Amino acid sequence: MNRPIKFRACYLPTLKMFDMEDLIHEEHLLDMLTMVNGKSKEDFSPLMQFTGFYDRNGKEIFEDDIVEIRNHPFDRFIGIDGMYRVGYSDRMEICCGSWLLHHVLPYATVVGNMYQHPHLLGGTEDE
């Protein structure tokens, strides 16, 4: 799969999302182990990479996004509809929950991410 390489990170104190251009200064990647634009590395989420996939509305899907699966034709048989975190399986396949993401794309909508919207996965706003 040929896809653009994109990353983003969430600044946790304000929950503001920064894309890679925001994290690069004067054409050099800033030392992520110390400071980013005067902010401590510990204040940022881990980097989230673009999966190369888009949801049913054309929105980019990144690692740690939360997608909602709705109206999947198999839902009445095996219960697919619901909210899932996007990530990699043990076999390095891009999944949402235990479902392969590319199999459910026509039914997937990005509704948030696990840093700004943990409540969508049953967590709390404070996590």
Language-model region placement:
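Secondary-structure transition motif
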Residues: 1-127
